[in-house]
């Protein structure tokens, strides 16, 4: 029997081979899959004909999260897909924030995925075998002043640094 839950799944860095078995199982069990339209090309082989797919454009994260709660609160199992890992610049933080704001009883399950920085590191050798950091250059949710401080701190500490969202 299906239950009202949201599965937030990281689908990896852009290749079906990088999607974890746990995410594949979640896709198969979901009534509804919600995500950025580009991501569906990587997952369609695991979806049944009955699965409702809702694709949205970029910068529609809040709308995707709201839709997920609307469907889950109707008793559906909903899978919200993110590229890479859903907890690293993905949908998981927003889903948890919205759960708190709504006072929702919907169960949340986060399934990690392989991040772009992990995939890139594997192709380069082993540059993140010790301490490292990840910094996003996106100023949509963080001021540029804070981003600059983080860049300076990472450089001062001599961290290997993965940079997301360069403009």
Residue spans for each PLM region:
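Active-site nucleophile and cofactor-binding loops and adjacent substrate-binding regions
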Residues: 109-115
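Beta-strand/loop-alpha-helix module characteristic of Rossmann-like adenine-cofactor folds
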Residues: 2-8, 115-167
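Class I S-adenosyl-L-methionine
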Residues: 1-108, 119
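Structural signal for conserved beta-strand scaffold positions within catalytic alpha/beta enzyme cores
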Residues: 35, 54-55, 110, 133-136, ...
């Amino acid at each position: 029997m299906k239950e009202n839950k949201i599965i937030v799944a990281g689908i990896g860095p852009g290749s079906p081979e990088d999607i974890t078995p746990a995410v594949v199982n979640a896709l198969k069990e979901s009534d509804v899959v919600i995500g950025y339209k580009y991501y569906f090309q990587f997952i369609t082989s695991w979806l049944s004909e009955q699965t409702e797919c809702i694709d949205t454009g970029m910068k529609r994260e809040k709308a995707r999260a709201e839709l997920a709660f609307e469907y889950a609160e109707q008793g559906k199992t909903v899978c919200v897909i993110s590229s890479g890992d859903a907890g690293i610049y993905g949908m998981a933080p927003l889903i948890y924030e919205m759960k708190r704001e709504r006072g929702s009883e919907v169960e949340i399950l986060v399934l990690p995925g392989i991040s772009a920085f992990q995939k890139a590191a594997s192709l380069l050798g082993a540059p993140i075998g010790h301490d490292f950091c990840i910094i996003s250059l996106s100023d949509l949710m963080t001021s540029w002043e804070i981003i600059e401080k983080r860049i300076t701190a990472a450089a001062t500490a001599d961290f290997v640094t993965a940079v997301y969202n360069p403009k």
